[in-house]
């Protein structure tokens, strides 16, 4: 009698391979901490409008070059030649979408929310301390790049429609929730690093109420934002404008300096009146002046950003003035008593090389860009 054949075992379903965890994000340079010196005063209110409006001109996009194996992509940051598009079928649409979203009133903070919505209950110094706390919070948990910019964007929009008390614990909860919400938007792996209970525990709430308090605040913030979370920030535009940069040391220094200038502008109440693309372009202008020491703008950059150097005059001068005051204050605090004075550039480093003010480059520019 033939032996009975055993049934074949069912195939084992293997779980799908996990995606590689992203590399540790770049840690931004630390922003100043409270108490803040006199240079942290808000920007003066602009005349004749809520915020600078970019020139009404058609954004020039570099045409697609013929596909040739010997046609290199131009990566020099000082080149004036036409650059090929990285994603030709969608480059125009991406550019148009970003520009439309940044000018959408529904996704912009109120120009004077401290004076109107907050009614004087919150000062520019209190807001600056919230931004500094949010920066420390995001760096402590090593959250994704761009989290601080988006969190500040959420905070300003939230404060534009929601009156807040001056309770320090409540303001910390608002700031921490903005960071938590922004981090989840920027990186899908955020919950591997931090959750609502961890957010509330660091804010001083007890174990019985901490998760509930963060969830309630997150719901309130989402409602205040109208569930519109994807508006571009200055970080978005710095990455967009430098997308043609290579991996060279100079290009990396320029991008890092541009992000440092953009992040530094978050501390000062008033920069939110500038469009994010203007803040980003001005940050690149000052970064080139800081790193290269010459030629902060070019026709290539004017075509890429859509702004001439003269269009950036107001934001560049405001940003440079705040950066110089912050650097001077930091230098005075760190200089030993009786030490001889040395030159300070906009990044706070000691140099003997004098730096020409940015507005002189703009005024002396004889070109159309």
Curated annotation (Swiss-Prot):
Family: Belongs to the cyclin family. Cyclin F subfamily.
Pfam name, any one: Cyclin_C
Record GO cellular component, one term: cyclin-dependent protein kinase holoenzyme complex
Listed InterPro entries: Cyclin (IPR039361), Cyclin-like_dom (IPR013763), Cyclin-like_sf (IPR036915), Cyclin_C-dom (IPR004367), Cyclin_N (IPR006671)
Domain of life: Eukaryota
Gene Ontology BP terms: cell division; G1/S transition of mitotic cell cycle
Region: Disordered, residue numbers: 328-350
Name under which the protein is recorded: Putative cyclin-F1-1
Source organism per UniProt: Oryza sativa subsp. japonica
Molecular functions per Gene Ontology: cyclin-dependent protein serine/threonine kinase regulator activity
Tagged with keyword Iron: no
Keywords: Cell cycle, Cell division, Cyclin
